[in-house]
From Swiss-Prot:
Main localization, broad class: cytoplasm
Keywords: Cytoplasm, Hydrolase, Metal-binding, Nucleotide-binding
Compartment(s) of residence: Cytoplasm
Entry note: cofactor: Binds 1 divalent metal cation per subunit.
Residues noted as binding a divalent metal cation in the record, renumbered to the chain: D8, D9, S39, N91
Pfam families tied to this protein: SurE
Protein name in UniProt: 5'-nucleotidase SurE
Record-annotated membrane-spanning stretches: none
InterPro entries referenced in this protein's UniProt entry, alphabetically: SurE (IPR030048), SurE-like_Pase/nucleotidase (IPR002828), SurE-like_sf (IPR036523)
């Protein structure tokens, strides 16, 4: 099995190194990742400046672009083959609830999904790499569980669920404190904290985006709740942003506008 690994923290981050070391035991693994930290770049693609691919001493390839750029370039020419799985991470910090909209980690996995390849975004819920070895081992265990279905896809017999996109958050805890795995829906956060302003040495006002807001929908069944109870959370995602519940309302509103003319 062939796996493409990306991330948004950059090719030198501890999370992607640990993930590579864990997955190379069970698959042929290739790393194509951003040169620099690209957190919160979502699905952004670079369209107005050139990008370059370089190779690090450990064989990782890195690009002066976004996480989605890296996956896009890898899949459209750099690799020369189609991987069976795209994996992104392990991110330094959670990607739960509304985080998934902004996350470069999720954006990289989503790019793989958009190309019809099963994809997984892995994140560790608390910043810092205290238990990154645990997170990497848990990530490998999940991939191993999914291998039979991935092999079916590779042989050309597409199961009904393929492709799929999973968002996985792993508690930053010792292995014996993790309670298991729960499939959960996305929770929600309050709006981001107030923008931070500072004055530059030249007297100019500088602005920094405030921190993520606290959880506001974090009840049972959400990713926030699962990880708070020391479970690994797994959330299946898709890219359909249609508000299906309100479609009938807007159809009626459009009909009234049509009648008015």
């Amino acid at each position: 099995m062939k796996i493409l690994i990306c991330n948004d923290d950059g090719y030198q981050a501890s999370g992607i190194i640990a993930l590579y070391e864990a997955l190379k035991i069970v698959a042929d693994v290739e790393v194509v990742a951003p040169e620099q930290n690209n957190s919160a770049k979502s699905n952004a693609l670079t369209l107005h400046s050139p990008m370059y691919v370089q190779t690090a001493a450990n064989g990782f390839r890195y690009i002066n672009g976004t996480p989605a750029d890296c996956v896009h370039i890898a899949l459209t020419g750099l690799l020369g083959y189609r991987p069976d799985l795209v994996v992104s991470g392990i991110n330094n910090g959670a990607n739960m609830g509304d985080d998934t909209i902004y996350s470069g980690t999720v954006g990289a996995a989503m790019e793989g999904y958009l190309f019809g390849i099963p994809s997984i975004a892995f994140s560790q819920t608390e910043k810092g790499w205290a238990h990154i070895d645990v997170a990497a081992r848990r990530a490998r265990e999940l991939v191993e569980q999914l291998m039979p279905s991935l092999e079916v896809v590779a042989e050309g017999a597409q199961p009904a669920l393929a492709p799929w996109l999973l968002n996985v958050n792993i508690p930053n805890l010792p292995d014996d404190q993790i309670q298991g795995v729960k499939v959960a829906r996305l929770g929600r956060r309050h709006a981001a904290e107030r923008v931070i302003t500072q004055t530059s040495p030249r007297g100019e006002t500088m602005y920094w985006i405030g921190g993520a807001g606290p959880a506001k929908e974090a009840g049972e069944g959400t990713d926030f709740y699962a990880t708070s109870q020391k479970f690994v959370s797994i959330t299946p995602l898709h890219v359909d942003l249609t508000d299906h519940e309100r479609l009938p309302y807007w159809e009626q509103a459009a009909a009234r506008l049509t009648q008015a003319h």
